[in-house]
Amino acid sequence: MEDFVRQCFNPMIVELAEKAMKEYGEDLKIETNKFAAICTHLEVCFMYSDFHFINEQGESIVVELDDPNALLKHRFEIIEGRDRTMAWTVVNSICNTTGAEKPKFLPDLYDYKENRFIEIGVTRREVHIYYLEKANKIKSENTHIHIFSFTGEEMATKADYTLDEESRARIKTRLFTIRQEMANRGLWDSFRQSERGEETIEEKFEITGTMRRLADQSLPPNFSCLENFRAYVDGFEPNGCIEGKLSQMSKEVNAKIEPFLKTTPRPIKLPDGPPCFQRSKFLLMDALKLSIEDPSHEGEGIPLYDAIKCMRTFFGWKEPYIVKPHEKGINSNYLLSWKQVLAELQDIENEEKIPRTKNMKKTSQLKWALGENMAPEKVDFDNCRDISDLKQYDSDEPELRSLSSWIQNEFNKACELTDSIWIELDEIGEDVAPIEYIASMRRNYFTAEVSHCRATEYIMKGVYINTALLNASCAAMDDFQLIPMISKCRTKEGRRKTNLYGFIIKGRSHLRNDTDVVNFVSMEFSLTDPRLEPHKWEKYCVLEIGDMLLRSAIGQMSRPMFLYVRTNGTSKIKMKWGMEMRRCLLQSLQQIESMIEAESSVKEKDMTKEFFENKSEAWPIGESPKGVEEGSIGKVCRTLLAKSVFNSLYASPQLEGFSAESRKLLLVVQALRDNLEPGTFDLGGLYEAIEECLINDPWVLLNASWFNSFLTHALR
């Protein structure tokens, strides 16, 4: 039967039926007749809706496929086939917009012409018997019932068949065809006899013979027969005594359950050591942009042209010198690399026509900075078999680092609003169904809250840099290509703006595997003096390269302009994820959406509008040493987005491990707050697993610090 269903029905219908059975905990391998019945019912619901539209005059019309008028409003809203939460959201929305009475059970369709819900039935028995069962179950005059049988009979409330003769004939023909196909394969009798009434019937299912012997052999230890195991499972209390459960398990399991009380958990131990350093691929709050408004120059949109145009807006260049050396690097090479960039950009400007890309001369300073010829020679393993002391080279353990205040400042800054608009979501067509209308409304509200956010700027900057670097890595594998770090935005007044943050020079990039590394040197403009927090800039050599005139309330003032230079590296897989940083917007929108859904299910109506427009309501944002921080819904949106963006910018194995292990402790603490009396074993092992992830990563250390604040306030 399962094979027949997969051959006979559209794959989309099969997939929806699989999901429905999974949702109700039914096994389609066993309940094959039910699988076929669900697919049949879904197909009838879809056929009922197909080709039926409402025109501008409010009349119901039938329109075949490929008709230019196919953008008319659908007559029927399909509720069947959606997961329960979404289905009820649609039903609630329809009731709110049309004034229809809310049904007790989920109906299958809503008819916008007749303004009524419809329950579709497909039966293998007498239509009038099935109709009465449906009517007794629903007990509502507002839901229209329409029953079809496999023999071509039908029955509907007050003999009102809703659809025209031809549409109903299509459904009956399809049902008859399904019956014939089943009969040809010898499946029909079993299918016909398997139909139950609307009330579920419990029966004792006996297992005999070989299956019984197999069942007895397959029991867990300490169970002598299937009846004992059944009785144990039936009496299993999920929140019962854990020790009792463990005693029934294998003798190998030896765990003493300790009660988890308010006094049980201790704070996570953060490592001691020198302060942690900045390790993102580009500057965040410290970045400085050279910008042009309303770009209309020749070659606008070509990165090199845009970069040169932005560079021309600054007139305060001066002879560069080192203000904060890199402790381990040859700092003169970083200085020479910047001078080379300036000189080669000047050469481009002197040319008659500016090229689209610029490959840097392979000077000694760039070769050093990009690690050219530094990789150890690869030797085939077969040629080394005879070497007696062959071993992997020793690698040093990473040095432990302590949490530093700069990472919290970075996060706070990422949550702030800028004076530019960083995302513009394209129009995606007119909303037809209620669920689309709700989705668009939520998306628009969310976009309004985050489009000016600095975290959104980081997304667009990350997408641009990773895309440009991956393109160059594939297109110019052997070249030291100069890649401008650019972003685009709009001012509050709606004027377009192109920004230059600095430059990247890419090293050799023969990237065969996803994890093969391409080295690059980044050179980024900033007004931040590195001497204020030298530990943050451990990996950088910082030059002073000019003086910038800034307008302030007290007039013009001059500030030194710095260039942050460092050697860095990335891989194909990291660039691929960097290019997809816009996913962070989706992730944080989904988190907000789940908050709206929770609110809506309590109020039994869609609360999107109230959620975003009630400015007086304060929402919890996070934990700090002061307690639970609260803010507007806009602040919640921006904080969730910033967390998602930082998870992307500071992605690492340390973060993966900390997130997975700390979640376990979080769940236990939440169970305690919910008075569920949790018990634990090997809590020390869990702390060990969490703390081994706290090494030197600034974002992980900050998350651990937040977790400690949560523990303090949650267990008061």
UniProtKB/Swiss-Prot annotation:
Cofactor list: Mn(2+)
Subcellular location: Host cytoplasm; Host nucleus
GO biological process entries: cap snatching; DNA-templated transcription; symbiont-mediated suppression of host gene expression; symbiont-mediated suppression of host mRNA transcription via inhibition of RNA polymerase II activity; viral RNA genome replication; viral translational frameshifting
Residues the entry annotates as binding Mn(2+) 2: 80, 108
GO MF annotation list: endonuclease activity; metal ion binding; RNA binding
Listed GO CC annotations: host cell cytoplasm; host cell nucleus
Cofactor: record remark: Binds 2 manganese ions per subunit.
EC number: 3.1.-.-
Keywords from the named record: Cap snatching, Endonuclease, Eukaryotic host gene expression shutoff by virus, Eukaryotic host transcription shutoff by virus, Host cytoplasm, Host gene expression shutoff by virus, Host nucleus, Host-virus interaction, Hydrolase, Inhibition of host RNA polymerase II by virus, Manganese, Metal-binding, Nuclease, Phosphoprotein
Similarity field: Belongs to the influenza viruses PA family.
Function per UniProt: Plays an essential role in viral RNA transcription and replication by forming the heterotrimeric polymerase complex together with PB1 and PB2 subunits. The complex transcribes viral mRNAs by using a unique mechanism called cap-snatching. It consists in the hijacking and cleavage of host capped pre-mRNAs. These short capped RNAs are then used as primers for viral mRNAs. The PB2 subunit is responsible for the binding of the 5' cap of cellular pre-mRNAs which are subsequently cleaved after 10-13 nucleotides by the PA subunit that carries the endonuclease activity.
Listed name of the protein: Polymerase acidic protein
